[in-house]
């Protein structure tokens, strides 16, 4: 492969993206020279992909002291370089809505997704590092990921971040002010970040992709105002409004309470994408008819968590019934099964809602959540219990509720040590995996080098199913089923 001049090759590709013309070549040359350092003009490359070219320019800048050695500093420069191939926010929005109206919503969405990958806002190469596998369980095929895409902070970055003065700008990583933000040691680079504006019930919202996607076309819908997460009747209206505007996507919201909520409760937002989760495939276990809403198909879903599914053609009726279920749940207690609406003035009940279109009808899944703690379960009664926390101890948020486990990076190395232990080899297995590993040893009599990896995957899937069962309010036994029935009777069902 012929060597080409790195800077010239990068500039050629920038011009090909049509934000600049040949007339801008000298301007681009000098701007990039300033960012990366003189001398780069002599550097050659064999690479062709623009992201690879960007990485080589960043590497040169690090070697010549134009940018620091921490990953965040390098990301800031990388995003600034990729900003050259990213149109201005006004142009991105203009193109999106022109395509949406004149061609199709699907094409507009696809173009924006392609741009977000092309300009390295979606970190496709980092995402490819994630470990992923499906596991068959009694609830269907659950999905397991070990999340290796997000770079862990290096010691230099941590030390520098401690010295930095606190900044209140942007207020959080979901604020609109992130669009084009340079980034800093303790805050991600967003120079190449773009947000599509859209109207939702007379309010402006934003649509963007997730840089470290957990599934196909993982996107975020965000309130343009920085206000806390809140599940209300308006939430159901918003979710159903979004799936009508963004065909092919599901959308859901994290719960609005600690323990059962997501990692960001301070800014109203939803997550969506083009992916079919195990929960969506799960069948109705018990059919229901709610009084006054006989046109809505409803039922309890066969799922480890407690899910009521509603399906119908009338958005208004679905929103009204979902709101009735939410309001009933917020005030509902059943001490026989440790279900408590509030204690000491603290509310415990909320819902994790998910909306999708299926066979032309609107569908809502309402997952009942309870964030109580107890002496026995200080992390949460309906949260992964201590015996499974060696695998998963973090909150069970929207994505996991639907059947996709997001497991911590530490497990990659730790599970290799568990494999060695199961094979009787010398190992450094963490003590907290001991009971689990011994159970696996007892369960399988023929563990070998050939099958040990598959066995670990199957057992991880079983642990994740247990994690979801722990998070489920009504358990899959006679007591749980009867208690769930008492709740839906409280909402008002027709026998």
UniProtKB/Swiss-Prot annotation:
Keywords: Carbohydrate metabolism, Cytoplasm, Galactose metabolism, Nucleotidyltransferase, Transferase. One of its GO terms (molecular function) is UDP-glucose:hexose-1-phosphate uridylyltransferase activity. Pathway: Carbohydrate metabolism; galactose metabolism. It is found in: Cytoplasm. Its main location: cytoplasm. HAMAP family: GalP_UDP_trans (MF_00571). InterPro entries: GalP_uridyl_Trfase_II, GalP_uridyl_Trfase_II_CS, GalP_Utransf_C, GalP_Utransf_N. It comes from the Bacteria. It catalyses: alpha-D-galactose 1-phosphate + UDP-alpha-D-glucose = alpha-D-glucose 1-phosphate + UDP-alpha-D-galactose. GO terms for biological process: galactose metabolic process. GO terms for cellular component: cytoplasm. It is an enzyme of class 2 (transferase). Belongs to the galactose-1-phosphate uridylyltransferase type 2 family. Its EC number is 2.7.7.12. It comes from Ligilactobacillus salivarius (strain UCC118). This is Galactose-1-phosphate uridylyltransferase.
């Amino acid at each position: 492969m012929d060597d080409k001049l790195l800077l010239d090759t990068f500039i050629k590709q920038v011009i090909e993206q049509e934000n600049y013309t040949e007339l801008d070549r000298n301007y681009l040359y000098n701007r990039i020279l300033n960012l990366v350092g003189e001398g780069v003009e002599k550097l050659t490359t064999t690479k062709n992909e623009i992201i690879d070219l960007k990485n080589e320019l960043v590497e040169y800048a690090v070697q010549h002291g134009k940018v620091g050695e921490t990953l965040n500093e390098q990301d800031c420069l990388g995003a600034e370089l990729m900003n050259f191939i990213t149109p201005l926010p006004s142009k991105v929005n203009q193109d999106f809505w022109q395509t949406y109206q004149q061609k199709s919503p699907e094409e507009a969405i696809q173009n924006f997704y392609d741009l977000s990958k092309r300009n390295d806002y979606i970190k496709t190469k980092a995402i490819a590092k994630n470990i992923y596998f499906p596991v068959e369980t009694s609830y269907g095929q659950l999905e397991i990921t070990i999340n290796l895409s997000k770079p862990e902070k290096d010691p230099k970055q941590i030390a520098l971040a401690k010295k930095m003065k606190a900044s209140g700008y942007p207020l959080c990583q979901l604020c609109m002010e992130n669009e084009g933000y340079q980034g800093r040691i303790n805050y991600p680079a967003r120079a190449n970040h773009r947000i599509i504006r859209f109207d939702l019930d007379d309010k402006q919202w934003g649509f963007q992709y997730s840089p470290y996607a957990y599934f196909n076309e993982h996107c975020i819908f965000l309130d343009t105002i920085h206000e806390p997460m809140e599940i209300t009747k308006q939430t159901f209206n918003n979710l159903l409004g979004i799936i009508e505007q963004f065909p092919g996507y599901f959308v859901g919201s994290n719960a609005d309470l600690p323990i059962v909520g997501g990692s960001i409760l301070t800014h109203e937002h939803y997550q969506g994408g083009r992916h079919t989760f195990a929960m969506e495939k799960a069948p109705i276990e018990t059919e229901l008819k709610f009084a006054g809403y006989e046109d809505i198909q409803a039922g309890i879903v066969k799922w480890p968590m407690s899910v009521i599914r509603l399906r119908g053609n009338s958005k208004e009726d679905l929103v009204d019934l979902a709101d009735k279920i939410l309001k009933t749940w917020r005030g509902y207690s059943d001490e026989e099964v440790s279900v408590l609406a509030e204690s000491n003035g603290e509310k415990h009940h909320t819902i994790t809602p998910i909306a999708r279109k299926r066979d032309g009808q609107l569908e809502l899944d309402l997952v009942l959540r309870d964030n109580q703690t107890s002496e026995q379960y200080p992390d949460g009664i309906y949260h992964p219990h201590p015996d499974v926390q060696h695998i998963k101890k973090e909150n069970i948020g929207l994505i996991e509720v639907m059947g996709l486990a997001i497991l911590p990076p530490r497990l990659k190395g730790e599970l290799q040590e568990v494999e060695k232990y199961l094979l009787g080899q010398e190992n450094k297995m963490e003590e907290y995996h001991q009971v689990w590993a011994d159970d696996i040893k007892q369960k399988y009599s023929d563990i070998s080098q050939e099958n040990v990896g598959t066995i670990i995957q199957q057992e991880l899937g079983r642990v994740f199913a247990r994690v979801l069962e722990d998070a489920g309010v009504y358990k899959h036994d006679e007591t749980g089923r009867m208690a769930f029935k008492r709740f839906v009777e409280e909402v008002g069902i027709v026998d």
